[in-house]
Design a protein with these regions (language model features):
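A late C-terminal transmembrane helix in Major Facilitator Superfamily
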Residues: 135-168
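Interfacial helix-cap and linker-helix signal at transmembrane-aqueous boundaries
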Residues: 37-38, 69-74, 159-169
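Cytoplasmic membrane-interface "Motif A"-like loop-to-helix N-cap segments
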Residues: 71-86
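C-terminal ends and interior cores of transmembrane alpha-helices
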Residues: 87-101
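Extracytoplasmic gate region of multi-pass secondary transporters
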Residues: 9-66, 121-122, 126, 153-161
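Multi-pass alpha-helical transporter architecture, strongest
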Residues: 96-98, 183-208
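A membrane-interface helix-boundary motif in multi-pass transporters
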Residues: 77-80, 162-190
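Short, small-residue-biased leader/transition segments that mark boundaries at the very start
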Residues: 1-3
């Protein structure tokens, strides 16, 4: 089977879609997390930036540990840790969005979110793609997943901006009040879809 035929297999595109939805949640926090903390929770600029930056630092740890998680704890099975860290991603995002204003809660949410995203980037964007295609097709498969992910990140930015802007109310004194409810549901839904989609590849890989 040629590379083109391999890339036509549903498993590659399911994985690309899963990674794309994961990137929506990832860049939602990186792009809009500071504004959310400022407007929804009353954090100062320094506080908001400091909290959101934690997830990037912990993402490095998640990336470093991702191979160890799958190889040592799960004997090379990527699906189980991808599911577990996908759920952790959604839980951390929900904690960030709905967990209240306490500093420690928001710091904890970004610690968990960063670790989860770091692991998922390696799994959905790399290791799982390598697992489902022959070695000669891995570059093409990674390219498909990467392109889908960054297209989704761009769409997220536009969609999130529209959802946020369309739910701003202006008081008589000119003060703006943000309703992050709709965009928060969009981000949560994307994170949930991202960990459900790879489950569809179980049967397909068995038949390959």
């Amino acid at each position: 089977m040629c590379i083109r035929d391999r890339l036509r297999t549903p498993a590659v595109w399911v994985l690309a879609a899963a990674s794309a939805f994961m990137y929506i949640s990832r860049y939602a926090i990186n792009g809009w997390g500071v504004l959310f903390l400022q407007e929804a929770k009353g954090f100062s600029d320094v506080e908001a930036i400091s909290v959101v930056s934690i997830n990037a630092l912990l993402g490095i740890l998640g990336t470093v540990l991702s191979g160890w998680f799958s190889d040592k704890l799960f004997k090379g099975d990527r699906k189980i840790p991808a599911l577990l860290f996908g759920i952790l991603n959604s839980v951390a995002l929900a904690l960030f969005l709905y967990g209240g204003n306490a500093m420690w809660v928001n710091v904890l949410s970004m610690v968990l979110f960063g670790i989860a995203i770091g692991v998922l980037i390696c799994f959905l964007g790399g290791l799982m793609a390598v697992d489902i295609v022959p070695r000669k097709a891995t570059g093409a498969a990674l390219g498909v997943v990467g392109i889908a992910s960054y297209i989704a990140a761009g769409i997220q930015d536009v969609a999130s901006g529209w959802l946020i802007d369309s739910h701003i109310t202006v008081a008589t004194d000119g003060a703006k009040h943000y309703d992050f409810g709709p965009v928060a549901l969009f981000w949560i839904a994307a994170s949930v879809i991202s960990f459900l989609l790879p489950l569809m590849n179980r049967k397909q890989k068995t038949e390959a």
